[in-house]
Design a protein with these regions (language model features):
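Short beta-edge/loop segments at beta->alpha junctions of small alpha/beta modules
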Residues: 1-71
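Nucleic-acid-binding surface
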Residues: 18-19, 52-202
Length: 202
């Protein structure tokens, strides 16, 4: 049974019980418990699994973040690190979602999701890394996501304390940033963007 299961589900880097039921309409979920004890599978969170033969790479973690809480896309600190904006690595997968804010502590790391308004769920793209495809905020959108939900970024000094890479920030498409900014319709965000601009070109 397991060999057949593995052959079919190997097409899914991360699979849900719903994925399993589509492939195996009559499936005893007790098998999942048994296979975990045999170290064939690892449960990420309720209803989501991956095979223990999987190599845990960055692309896999990004893909997993999208899969286990959908709709969502990689954003905030994780995306800033991906684009080289922040100097240090991150130890938690951070995403934007239109669902409620939550966090999952799993055997492969922490996955944090921050709620944004449904009308702000845009500005992401699909890219490939380590053979995995996933949704990640565009550079301009991750900047706005970050500023929108961080009230403390209210001065040039607050950005200086973050040590964001100015040379990478200069790669921002400022026309796109401005267009996206209008969709937020937030005076507070506009002020934070102004502080960011002063920081970049100080």
């Amino acid at each position: 049974m397991y060999i057949r299961f593995q052959q079919i589900m190997a097409f899914f880097p991360v699979f849900s019980t719903s994925d399993i039921e589509k492939a195996f309409p009559i499936f005893d979920k007790k098998a999942l418990v048994y296979w975990q004890k045999k170290h064939y599978l690892t449960k990420i969170r309720n209803g989501y699994y991956f095979f223990n033969t999987t190599q845990i790479e960055e692309g896999f973690l990004f893909f997993t973040a999208n899969k286990i809480y959908n709709p969502s896309y990689i954003s905030f600190e994780c995306a800033l690190s991906f684009y080289g904006i922040i100097p240090e690595g991150v130890f938690m997968m951070t995403s934007a979602t239109s669902l409620k804010t939550t966090i999952f502590n799993t055997q492969i790391g922490k996955f944090q999701y921050k709620k944004i308004k449904s009308n702000l769920f845009f500005g992401y793209k699909i890219i490939n890394l380590d053979k995995y495809s996933f949704k990640i905020a565009e550079l301009e959108k991750v900047i706005l996501d970050m500023l929108y939900l961080n009230e403390s970024l209210d001065s040039i000094e607050s950005f200086e304390s973050l040590r964001w890479n100015k040379e990478e920030l200069k790669k921002i498409n400022f026309e796109k940033l401005s267009n996206y900014q209008l969709l937020f319709n937030s005076n507070a965000l506009n002020k934070r963007v102004n502080h960011l601009m002063k920081y970049i070109y100080a």
